[in-house]
Regions:
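Mid/C-terminal beta-alpha module of Rossmann-like enzyme folds, strongest
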Residues: 215, 222-268
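NAD(P)H-binding glycine-rich loop region in Rossmannoid oxidoreductase-like domains
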Residues: 49-86
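Active-site Tyr-X1-5-Lys
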Residues: 117, 132-158, 163, 189
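N-terminal Rossmann NAD(P)H-binding glycine-rich loop of SDR-like oxidoreductase domains
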Residues: 3-23
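Conserved Rossmann-fold NAD(P)-dependent oxidoreductase catalytic core, especially the SDR/UDP-sugar
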Residues: 93-134
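Glycine/proline-rich active-site loop of Rossmann-fold NAD(P)-dependent oxidoreductases
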Residues: 140, 153, 165-182, 192, ...
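Amphipathic terminal alpha-helices
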Residues: 290-309
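Active-site loop of classical SDR/Rossmann-like NAD(P)-dependent oxidoreductases
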Residues: 241-242, 264-281, 290-291
Length: 309
């Protein structure tokens, strides 16, 4: 199988490439403006966004295209017009380059945050998006192009609306430490303190990276998953308040390293409704596949080792 991954130097793409290299013999092509340590692997072929002919040849020969490229939330806030423009142009380029035979699958990486801010209440794939944050809007622009693509061709485009992934980056230069759980883990080890910047009772759906990768593998290998809707929510089986996450990390530090980082709550509690973020079309992984604590422990252990090397 030939898998093309856009945004290959990014956080999600890095872990995806690592997983494919370690567990399959699939051919990998990456489209990315930035370089990554993965690109020295002979199994990984690299193209930059300014190499149009190379991109066209790469995408047209693909079995699966994972379109992960895009501005993250902070970048989108700083440059909203550029975020939307990149989402539109990059998605159009990928769609235009896909082979006309209709045998390739396009998987567009979107976000749970397109629904609302903050995420509250019952949310599934039928929920109408209403968030007007630049990050949400740029993702919705890409989604609309994929939906039009599905209506006008025999190709198969699938949209993944992904919860808040967390876990170690595969690439040390990956910009992932501003993510909530990643940032809490790093601060707990480096500063012996956990800062909770949002209301402590705000509830979010956090997805362990290993759980995300398992669900992505299921989507890639089983074309029927999500076929009826062309949209899939990627969710963890339970959502947690920020205070619960902070206390969990505090407890893991005590058990693993025999110290208790202080928790600093920066905002008062808010009158927030609970969150049930779920998918109607992809099964929740069984409890034996639960990687929540495993992902946190691996991140804490790696950070602790780096601080003491």
């Amino acid at each position: 199988m030939h898998i093309v991954i856009t945004g290959g130097s990014g956080y999600l793409a890095g872990r995806i490439i690592e997983k494919i290299l370690n567990s399959t013999d699939h051919e990998i092509s990456v489209i990315s403006q930035k370089k990554s340590s993965f690109f020295i692997n002979p199994r990984v072929k690299h193209s930059s966004w300014n190499e149009s002919d190379k991109i066209n040849n790469t995408v047209s020969s693909a079995d699966v295209i994972l379109h992960t490229a895009g501005f993250n939330a902070p970048e989108s806030s700083k440059n909203p017009d550029k975020a939307v423009d990149f989402a539109r142009k990059s998605t159009k380029r990928i769609i235009k380059a896909m082979k006309p035979s209709g045998n390739s699958n396009l998987i567009f990486f979107s976000t749970a945050h397109i629904y609302k801010s903050p995420l509250i209440g019952e949310i599934n794939e039928d929920t109408i998006p209403e968030n007007n944050h630049p990050y949400a809007l740029s993702n919705l622009v890409g989604e609309s192009l994929v939906e039009n693509f599905n209506m006008s061709t025999n190709n198969k485009g699938l949209i993944l609306r992904i919860g808040n992934c967390f876990g170690l980056p595969a690439n040390e230069s990956s910009n992932c430490w501003d993510l909530v759980i990643n940032g809490m883990c790093k601060s707990a080890i480096v500063n012996k303190k956990i800062n909770v910047s949002g209301p402590s009772n705000q509830v979010r759906n956090f997805v362990p990276m290993k759980t995300f990768l398992q669900k992505l593998q299921l989507v890639i290998e089983n074309e029927s998953v999500g076929k009826s809707s062309h949209i899939l929510n990627i969710a963890y089986m339970k959502s947690f308040a920020l205070s619960e996450i902070a206390e969990l990390i505090q407890t893991r530090c005590s058990e693993l390293f025999n110290f208790m980082p202080k928790i600093n709550y920066e905002k008062p509690k808010d009158n927030l409704i609970n969150l049930n973020y779920q998918s109607k079309y992809i099964q929740t992984l069984n409890k034996e596949d639960d990687h929540f604590l495993e992902e946190i422990d691996e991140m804490l252990t790696s950070l602790h080792q780096n601080c003491h090397d």
